[in-house]
Every structure is written in C-alpha cells, then in structure tokens.
Amino acid sequence: MPSAAAWWDWAVRLCLAAAAAAYGFTWVCVLAGTPSNKRLRQLLFVCLRVLFSLVRCIGKLLYAESAISRAYIQVLNHLILRRPLCLPPRQVLLLAPHCLQWDQCPHKITRNVQNCRRCGRCPIGEMTALSERLGISFAVVPGGTLARQVVAACRPKAVVAVACERDLISGMQDVAPLPAVGLLNKRPNGPCFNTDVDIRALTEILSAMIGEDA
C-alpha cells in the first residue's frame, strides 16, 4: 500500500497537472478571441496570474521556467494589443532598465534621460529619439522601486516596459489593472550587463499603443 508521502506526492502532481491544463485552456480562450467586456478581460488577467504561479512550479521541475515566463508575457501582450488602444502619446510611458546603458558611460540617465549624448554605444539614444518622435514619455530605471515611483508620478494610461522575464512579469503585475506591454531585452553579454533591445519591435509596439503606423 502506498505510503502517505507517496499519496501526497501524487496529489501534488495532479494539482500541478490540473493547473497546467487550466492555464493552457485559458491561453486557448485568449488566442481564440479576447473578450470585449472589460470585466471579463480583467477576470482573464486574474486567472492567468494565479495559474501562472502554479504552472511556474512545473516549469522549475522541468527546467522550463524561462520558456513558460516568455509564453506568459506573450499572452498578456496579446490581451492588450489585440485591440488598438489609440491613446494620446503622452499617456503612454516607456520604461527601460539601466542595464541597457553602456557600462562605461559617464552620464547619469536614470533621473533624466536627456543626459544621454546619443553616442550610439547603447540603444538608449535610439530609444530617446523614438520617444521624442512619437511624443511618448520615456524613463530609464535601475529597479522595480524606482519604476513604481515613475509610474505613480507620471500616471500614464498604459506602460511599455523593456526588461528580462522576471522583472517584466513582476512589473506588469504590479501596475495591473493598468495596461502594460512587455518586450524582452537581449542579453548578448549575459544578464544585467550591456543588454540590448529590438528597436523595430519596440517601434511597432509603441505605434500600436497610440494608433499610428510603425
């Protein structure tokens, strides 16, 4: 007869499997057609958030946590971008991590991004020019605490953030129910050091938020 520990192990496995199935079903519902009802969309966000925590446990066991996190970000983005927001540009806030800045740069940009000299050694200059061209607010932040302060100070109607999987997910959850779209940074030199971003993809996201062609 199986021991109590064995029964407990199987119960945990079944719960995780059920959570994974429910998460997958919710994702299918989202991709099939995002509901127009605001409360129903918010309910989907809540369901995804709760189920993601459980499914991430499965990801850790299968060494697939990063892939699951990327899929979660993709679903959240889909919920936001499926229907154009057409927001006034100044009501959209672009947040970028400090690790995008060239590590040898002497200019402090976390308090004022206009200190960027646009030398081309990192993507901050391009992002600054893009935000100015579109009329979007732009800030570079060293961490989640300052990011929340910037959001509270700017009071945007929507946020576009560039970061790694962990920071994107925590940030997108922190600002909920504010619409937030996440774009993963590139890490050719490893995490948190001279990272990069796909400017073309960022342009498309920002343009979609304000209802303009990229």
Which residues make up each language-model segment?
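N-terminal, charge-rich interaction modules
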Residues: 2-124
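Short His-Asn-centered micro-motif
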Residues: 96-97, 139-144, 160-164
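Short amphipathic alpha-helical segments
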Residues: 107-108, 152, 171-174
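A short, gly/pro- and small-residue-rich
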Residues: 113-117, 171-188
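Mid-length scaffold segments of soluble, non-membrane domains
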Residues: 116, 120-140
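Short, well-ordered alpha-helical microsegments
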Residues: 124, 147-149, 167-172
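Proline-aspartate-enriched helix->loop->beta-strand connector
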Residues: 155-157
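Ser/Thr/Gly-rich flexible loops in soluble cytosolic domains mediating phosphotransfer, phosphorylation
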Residues: 181-214
